[in-house]
Amino acid sequence: MIQRRNFIKTGIAGTTSMALGSILPASCKSETSSNAAQKIKVDLPRPITAMTEEYLGIKPLNLYGGYEEMMQKMRSYRPLDLNAVEWRKANPNKDYSEWARQARERLLSGLHYNLPPVNLQAQTLETVETDSFIREKIEFNSTPWFRVPGYFYIPKNVPLPAPALIVMHAWGGPMLFGADRICGEPVHPAIVNHRAETSSGRPLADWYASKGYAVIVIDAFHFGNRAPRGINGLPNSYDPSKLDNDTHLDYESRANGALHYGIRELNWAGTTWAGINYGDDSRCVDYLLSRKEVDDNRIGCTGLSGGGWRTNMIAALEPRVKATVTVGWMTTSDSQQAYNVNGAVNTFCMLPGVWDRIDIPDMISMASPKACMVVSGTEDILFPPVGKMEAARQISETYLWAGNPTLFRNYTPAKPHCYDQEIQEEALIWFNKHLKK
């Protein structure tokens, strides 16, 4: 009879070897069982760049201590390199459309979120009318398990159907508020402060509606009316607009503390945070197409920070959107991992098996022929200068390869992490050029 200790040494090891042998690439497999115990040498298809302060253009914020070298090696070994620039070098006889198809399939499959058919069952709950627009408080089904709250704007004084924008709130800021951050009169001092810091005090959705756009804004998962309740010390029911400052800060801390729990729950359920966000955002297009006030062929998308990330996803994967403006979320994966993961990369970015195959700029690169503008403030310290510059270079090169060099713009104002009045005006020019012609 096999002793338990020997079984652990031989049985499990042998089983593990067989299992790994069936999934590892040929370069990682040992040739014979006699050298199975020898150290496996992995060829790294990409050279490892030393992510120094000089290279990054800024001092790294959170190097992973003794694990840093291991992380860089892990990133350098690409099981499948679908970065546009690298793929083109390796496949000189293939065209842009083939790369974009493969990259898009990888990104979409990595979301692990298949949207089932659903009846939106949209409702308008209340209406506010101004001189420039009508704002409706709405809700609709994005899936059989999510009913999404938000706002829809009908512009006045313009011919209908009008062009439309999906406007996305940021990740950073008061988590107990989502769409309300950028819609309507501020319902809490936290919103006043957030707007002052990010949008020159303007409610962004109201402003775009006043410029002649139909607009939809929703609460992202874990924000606003979808913020945590009944967990981590949060009550089952509360109205964030009625919280005093101390209670609001306490609830904000508790909601943020539930993030790690949420990502584990979602992954265990077989999906990703990014998948839920993209699913909800894609359903916003369905909602827009259900409205007679919207021109189906003139839909755009924009957002700051986490909203900029979601805009990247829409640019990459949603064919019904024709123009985008990403504000405050563009870099390269390698430089970001070395510089600042903790401050910029959150649950909405987590896609195992994706970012070691494609890169962040590839989301915009695969969007051609959409008209895409990326805004990267030179004073935005969430991202390293080299990451922002290299991302723009890759996207420009890929749009040229796709035959649409004029449909990409990289705008680099001397701004911090914001979507202020100057950026708003530049974004409006971009949307007017591509959605109002």
Predicted regions and their residues:
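Mobile cap/lid helix-loop segments that gate and shape the active-site cleft of serine hydrolases
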Residues: G257-T271, D280-C284, K322-I364, P369, ...
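C-terminal catalytic histidine-bearing segment of alpha/beta-hydrolase fold enzymes
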Residues: R393-Q394, T398-K437
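Alpha/beta-hydrolase fold nucleophile elbow
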Residues: V294-G303
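Cap/lid segment of the alpha/beta-hydrolase catalytic domain
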Residues: M168-G279, S335-A338
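N-terminal export signals
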Residues: N6-S27
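Non-catalytic accessory segments flanking enzyme active sites
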Residues: M74-Y153
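C-terminal segment of N-terminal export signals and the immediately downstream linker at the start
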Residues: S22-P60
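Proline/glycine-enriched tight loop/beta-turn segments at coil->beta junctions
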Residues: W145-R147, K156-A164
